[in-house]
Amino acid sequence: MYSAMPGGDVAILTGRFSLLLEHRGKRPKVHESAYVAPTATICGDVTMGENSRVLFGAVVTAEGGPVEIGAECIVMENAVIRGAPKHPIRIGDHVLVRPRAYLTGCNIENNVFLATGSTVFNGAHLGEGSEVRVNGIVHLRTVLQKDSLVPIGWVAVGDPVEILPSHEHERIWALQEPLDFPGTVFGVERGPAGTMTPEMTRRYARGLEKHREDLPLGAGERLIVEG
């Protein structure tokens, strides 16, 4: 249950959050038993489940796509979890996100371990019980089946997935190129090297402009719980 107030709102305890933001008219929804450290940031359409924790310096931001974090999840120091317009983030229960991990627009099932420095890209799906070890990468639109393992520094790419050491550049690129990173993430057609970045940054800047309208929520303000 969320900590209800009259009208179906939720109270934020004084001093519990450092930077809690309304973004695009959406406010975070945080279970009364969850904890967010004083230097963490929670922005926009973010839902945190029972007994979950977001630690110091972590950022959880819904930039056009919602972020759902289940029960008893741990998001550790300086991790980033980012929902994207076409790729919301859904994280199941009992998921551990270690420091400096980066997750954007992905689906994480229950009981997944994401080690320090791991990266999971847009459209990826990690099956229950999977592990991505230190500096491992799960690339765009990649699917890991239940109990999969990405070793230290290796790259998982494709569906069906291949899990490869990082030095196998040519094989990784052969699998990655058809997944169309610029088109999937930025809506930009792939062109010659160096020609896509101006349009990608222009489009991304337009989306990020919405943050100018963010409203910081003070301690004790109420969070709207829809429905």
Protein language model regions, located:
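Glycine-rich hexapeptide-repeat left-handed beta-helix
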Residues: 2-25, 63, 77-78, 84-91, ...
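Extended, small-residue-rich solenoid/repeat segments and analogous flexible loops
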Residues: 2-53, 57-59
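Sequence/structural signature of small/polar-enriched beta-strand/turn repeats
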Residues: 48, 66-69, 88-91
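A short glycine/small-residue-enriched secondary-structure motif
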Residues: 70-74
